[in-house]
Regions:
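Short Lys/Arg-enriched alpha/beta "domain-start" segment
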Residues: 3-68
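Ampiphathic alpha-helical segments that act as solvent-exposed interaction surfaces
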Residues: 85-126
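Short, surface-exposed beta-strand/loop "edge" segments at domain boundaries and coil↔beta transitions
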Residues: 38-43, 77-81, 98-105
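Sparse, context-dependent recognition of short Cys/His-centered cofactor- or disulfide-binding micro-motifs
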Residues: 16-18, 75-77, 121
């Protein structure tokens, strides 16, 4: 059995509101969840959608992008973060107020639903 991954957040992005409108972020932290068995992006997108639909999540895919990108709110922890699928992994993108609990819970639900082990790595930049 693999060691449980840490979802400790080393750095948080900073939110900016440019004069021209919108919102931008300086810096990023993301957790890459890579399945222990190869899965296509389509299969990962289906797994993510099924896991989110099972709850306790409110989520939406609000942008017309060529890849899956959800804004997710864990109703149990109150954590809000983005989740995407790209290059054979599910990526959890930390927002300024995201805490580790919501990220960990989604990881646990994905692992339980898939029945496989996952490798988790954290990438952060300021």
């Amino acid at each position: 059995m693999a060691r449980e991954p840490s979802f400790s957040i080393p750095a948080r992005p900073r939110r900016r509101f440019p004069r021209r409108g919108g919102v931008e972020y300086d810096g990023q932290t993301l957790f890459r969840l890579v399945p222990g068995e190869p899965m296509s992006d389509e299969a990962l997108a289906d797994l993510l959608a099924e896991t989110l639909a099972a709850g306790p999540y409110r989520y939406g895919d609000f942008l017309n992008l060529p890849m899956v990108l959800y804004l997710v709110r864990d109703q149990g922890t109150g954590d809000v973060f983005r989740a995407s699928v790209r290059d054979g992994s599910i990526r959890l993108h930390v927002l300024p107020e995201t805490d580790s609990a919501g990220l960990r819970r989604l990881y646990e639900r994905l692992a339980e639903r898939s029945g496989i082990e996952w490798e988790v790595d954290c990438q952060s930049s300021e």
